[in-house]
């Protein structure tokens, strides 16, 4: 089955061609801060379409035992903004995906009760791209007047110029093992009730690399931080020059620990009539131990910490199958789920909010053992405020001051083939 998770691409009118300043796209160091209520919506384009494969295989061993294997590659979230959007310092592009391999079994204990379990191997990947604004970082690291002082020293030939913007990229890889267990109760030949539980997934060994695009100006500024006047004046300004220079090294090893939520699910299936099936599902996911924090491997210094105070997600879904003809089945579904981040802590690279799911589809069965399914769905996400989170640390990577509204709506197609 080909399936799609939460996917969105925001206004993406940009070029990926780099320039001599080490930037992916046109220069944006123009002092733009944005205006309160500025709106960022998804824009269709070639890079907002993703192909996400999935595979499921079930093999009956005997009348009571079935073993199965599944694999999926899911984009948990894809966001991309223009280079010049005012919140670019907090992250203008993010790609989070988890590839999961499952091996499991189902066993029928009695005519009305079955149990099942699976083990999973999960591969984690995250990529974040931000625009590093040196002038903004300098103004936040030192007391008021620091940038003016450095500009004066530059005019006197005593310091290099404060560099313009450049791209910084963070790539993280990791893996984890997990398991899931469930049971299925069939009180009648028309009704099935299922429940399952999956514990938290702990990616404790995620590592990767922080890359800062370097040019002549950034190299000269990093050298200035390592010595010269900054060795004398830095302590007076409360700035540790050598430490700041180390934080700006072009290549640094990075690490992250992240916990994905546990999940409890209960579902109901009822064969109402020869033509109509009814379904309902409730899902509970506890995100309260999830956090976004990235550190340097060499010294443990924080690259970025994004406090978001994640909450519990409750999801409700209902659906039906209607069979107008022997070989054709129509599907319809609706779902709703609360967001896990409040307005005051929502960040651009994770603009999560309350959402609703709408889906329509059809299955055609040309032969007894073959079914082809096609579906269309809409994820309708409430527009959410971004840019209010003032708790991002260190302060120099908190991004420019901006207040905006992001809309994560997305559409997707699903194609399935069962043999």
Where are these regions (language model features)?
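Surface-exposed strand-loop-strand hairpins of Gram-negative outer-membrane beta-barrel proteins
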Residues: 7-48
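Short secondary-structure capping/turn segments at boundaries of alpha-helices and beta-strands
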Residues: 1, 43-44, 53-56
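Outer-membrane beta-barrel porins/channels
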Residues: 18-31, 49-419
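Glycine- and acidic-residue-biased ligand/ion/polar-headgroup-sensing regions
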Residues: 2-6
């Amino acid at each position: 089955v080909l399936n799609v998770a939460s996917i969105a691409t925001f206004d993406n009118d940009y070029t990926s061609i780099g320039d001599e300043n080490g930037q992916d796209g046109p220069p944006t160091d123009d002092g733009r801060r944005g205006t309160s209520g500025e709106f960022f919506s998804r824009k269709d384009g070639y890079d907002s379409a993703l192909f996400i494969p999935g595979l499921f295989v079930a093999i009956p061993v005997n009348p009571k035992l079935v073993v199965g294997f599944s694999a999926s590659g899911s984009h948990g979230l894809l966001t991309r903004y223009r280079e010049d959007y005012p919140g670019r310092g907090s992250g203008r592009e993010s790609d989070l995906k988890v590839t999961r391999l499952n091996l499991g079994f189902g066993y029928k204990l009695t005519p009305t009760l079955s149990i099942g379990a699976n083990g999973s191997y999960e591969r984690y990947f995250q990529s974040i791209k931000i625009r590093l604004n040196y002038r903004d970082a300098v103004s936040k690291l030192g007391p008021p007047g620091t940038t003016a002082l450095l500009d004066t020293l530059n005019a006197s030939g005593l310091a290099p110029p404060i560099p313009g913007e450049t791209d910084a990229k963070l790539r993280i890889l990791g893996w984890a093992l997990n398991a899931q267990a469930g049971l299925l109760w069939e009180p009648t030949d028309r009704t099935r009730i299922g429940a399952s539980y999956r514990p938290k997934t702990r990616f404790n060994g995620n590592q990767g690399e922080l890359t800062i695009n370097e040019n002549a100006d950034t190299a000269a500024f990093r050298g200035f931080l390592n010595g010269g006047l900054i060795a004398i004046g830095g302590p007076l300004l409360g700035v540790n020059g050598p430490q700041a220079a180390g934080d700006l090294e072009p290549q640094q090893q990075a690490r992250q620990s992240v916990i994905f939520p546990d999940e409890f699910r209960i579902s109901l299936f009822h064969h109402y009539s020869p033509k109509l099936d009814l379904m309902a599902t409730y899902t509970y996911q506890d995100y309260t131990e999830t956090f976004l924090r990235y550190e340097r491997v060499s010294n443990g210094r924080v690259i970025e910490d994004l406090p978001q105070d994640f909450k519990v997600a409750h999801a409700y879904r209902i659906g039906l199958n209607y069979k107008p003809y022997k070989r054709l089945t129509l599907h319809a579904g609706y779902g709703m789920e609360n967001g896990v981040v409040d307005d005051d802590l929502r960040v651009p690279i994770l603009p999560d909010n309350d959402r609703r799911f709408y889906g329509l589809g059809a299955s055609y069965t040309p032969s007894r053992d073959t079914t082809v399914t096609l579906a269309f769905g809409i994820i309708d996400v409430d527009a959410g405020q971004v840019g209010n989170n003032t708790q991002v640390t260190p302060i120099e990577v908190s991004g420019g001051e901006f207040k905006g509204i992001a809309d994560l709506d997305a559409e997707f197609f699903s194609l399935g083939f069962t043999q």
